[in-house]
């Protein structure tokens, strides 16, 4: 983007900034520019899904902050298209690193995950289904029960593994598919969307609300290693119980299997985050259960 355009954006919103430069951490959806030391400019790619995501952010972030969630304040949102061909958003800058950049496992960052869980509880309990956020929906994933057979037919494994995975999903389906209360979800809880102070790892904020919407609260416990979930649940339950508390772990496990099988058919993704890699989540599920977790997790595992 020409520097003159960036300077015009800064001038329009009355910001006093120093150097302006493009961040090396640009994501799939947005180009990111650092406006001095205090602000971040997010400019979506010029395509309908990316533009829709930043519009969702513009209403989700104020609602989340009002509920007590730690997330950077929205300083400005401009959809006039007078300076850029797409809407854009300016946020306060969080000075830290993404948790994903630290390359630390859940066992090395338990307090971070507990804090994330607490913020999810505040989000789920504190945002009501009214006002600008009321119509926001998360992108649905297909029912995973057909995926094992599809993957077996494609040659990823054999009919034996398909029967095992199908049986596991059948065990969890009554819990996951029951009518459930709707809660406002972040929708994309990857380690790259968790901001931390690195040494020692200290939670700072959740970022990137473009996938937010209404649904089962348990689905916000996916996109991250399953080994992190017990820490998150501990932090969450210090604030509030989960909706339909007695089936929460079953629904979380269903969601992890759903995403893992959905991703498994992709080709390798060497430049993307952990949650976008085809086999990482399925291997993580196996790793979690090889660690002999206690109940209720042990009751939800279906041995081969």
Predicted regions and their residues:
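An alpha-helical support segment within catalytic cores of ATP-dependent transferases
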Residues: 1-16, 82, 106-114, 121-187, ...
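Short, surface-exposed alpha-helical segments at coil->helix boundaries
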Residues: 3, 58, 230-233
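Alpha-helix C-terminal capping segments
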Residues: 10-13, 32-36, 64, 176, ...
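Short, surface-exposed acidic
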Residues: 16-20, 159-165, 242-251
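ATP-binding pocket architecture of kinase catalytic cores
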Residues: 20-138
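Active-site acidic catalytic loop and adjacent metal/ATP-binding pocket
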Residues: 28-36, 41, 74, 169-221
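Glycine-rich, phosphate-binding/catalytic loops in enzymes
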Residues: 57-58, 107-108, 202, 221-224, ...
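Helix-rich C-terminal or lid/interface subdomains of diverse kinases
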Residues: 99, 114-115, 178, 213-304
